[in-house]
Amino acid sequence: DCNGKITIKQIPDYRMIYERHFGSYEHMHRAWNKLLVHYRDYISRDTKFIEITYDDPSLTEAKNCLYDIGLSVGEECRLENTTILLGGKCAVYSFKGHIKSIYAAYQTLFLVWLPKTQYRLDEGRNIIDIYHTVDCAAMEVEMDICVPVK
């Protein structure tokens, strides 16, 4: 059920350090752990932890799924592996729950909520996940699924 969990918001542009990976989304936590250790000096109270998944795991073989993970940084960061994520109008699904339920949240957003609205997917921008809290022991997260719309 997504009623009350989805709002339309203006998302800012984010400069982010990122790493690109191929593989099952189920093993993404390993890549995250390495990234967080490697870039720990760039993490501050204002850091956003951002994920971009490019493939639907029901359509793409797990080993071929593509994703970027990263963290927001200031303008002063000049590392080679930085990019600018374009913000703009997004449908933001505030998700709180077990990581295994994230896929169902995506399905609800795209198959139930979006078709019933006047909005359309803005395919010129990335769908991003912004993590607020992660409880590794319980496998629970609080995150925003940000779907660019027009």
Residue ranges and their predicted role:
Residues 1-150:
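A solvent-exposed interaction/effector surface
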